[in-house]
Amino acid sequence: MGNYKVLVTGGAGYIGSVMVPQLLSSGYSVTVFDNFMYKQNSLLDVCYHPSFSVVNGDVRDIEALKKEIINHDIIIPLAAIVGAPACDRDPSLATDVNLTQVENISKWVSASQMVLFPVTNSGYGIGQEGVYCDEKTPLRPISHYGQTKVAAEDVLLQMGNVVTFRLATVFGCSPRMRLDLLVNDFV
């Protein structure tokens, strides 16, 4: 994959801890920017990889985040306060992490960089019986979580170098398991 340098904010989290080893095995150089809020060691298996580095930082630290953004080819913003209950507990924190971080990234990314942004299906809000969502389905988020993620996607889509992915509920085994998801009780 050439010498692409990838920055993954929140890279030690549920999705990142599965994605980062895959990126490394595909030949990318990967930097994880994470505050390790859950005190996890989810990247232990890759910590000695020669193309891996970690910045123990908070995405609300503007200067630290900017320094990393400008030195990478691909940015994958995974850092987030995830789910409606967590966002409702601290709406200000959720806005800062889920939206303001992305607004800042959009200011610092150059035309030669790429942003890959996973978005939640919570942006759709409550669906209608018998109607399936697709790319053209109107977004009507009802939770603060969905609202911040949809607003972040809107900011990024104004740029030309962005790909967004609307993910359904992500589930399954991960080095940083999410035990707050009912679906993971069945995995």
Model-inferred region functions:
Residues 16, 63, 85, 125-128:
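Glycine/Thr-rich phosphate-binding loops of Rossmann-like dinucleotide-binding domains
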Residues 59-96:
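NAD(P)H-binding glycine-rich loop region in Rossmannoid oxidoreductase-like domains
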Residues 67-68, 108, 155:
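CheY-like receiver
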Residues 1-74:
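N-terminal Rossmann/SDR dinucleotide-binding element
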Residues 110-114:
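A short helix->loop->beta-strand "cap" motif at the edges of active sites that frequently abuts
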Residues 9, 33, 75-79, 115-121, ...:
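SDR active-site strand-loop-helix element
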Residues 184-187:
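Alpha-helical substrate-binding/gating segment
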Residues 89-92, 96-104, 123-164, 169-178:
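Catalytic helix-loop patch of NAD(P)-dependent Rossmann-fold dehydrogenases
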